[in-house]
Amino acid sequence: MRRLGVNIDHIATVRNARGEIHPDPLNAAIFVKKVGADLITIHLREDRRHINDIDAKKICSIKGLLVNLEISTNENMIKKALKIKPNFVCIVPENRKEITTEGGLDLKKNKSKLKKIINKFKNKNIRTSLFINPTISDIIISKSLN
């Protein structure tokens, strides 16, 4: 049973703000695994604001560490995720001007698209979750998507 998951996005945010190579998200992932984390969460944003492609690939290759990769519904992001093969994918809404994720996916508008995306991950044995609003209707729609 998983007991501790750690989001390490802001390790990369600090690195990128400094314009340097440290702190390194890979080292952070290795460290939190060593001290007992069961899972690492990273968000590979379209604008690569924090975690970048190289970070994601390296972190997903750590043996014995489960990785939850947050991505948007952008086709390029879906392809990247299928290529690096995290254990889990969480599909999140993304707005370039937001500081952090501001709300859930628009499930009614994107139901068909989400179903196709979920099936792509399912076919590769990648478990998928959705970042949703806490409403009964979104819970019902999520369940219908599998």
PLM region spans:
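Conserved anion-binding
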Residues: 76-77, 84-146
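Conserved N-terminal beta1-alpha1 strand-loop-helix module at the mouth
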Residues: 1-86, 144
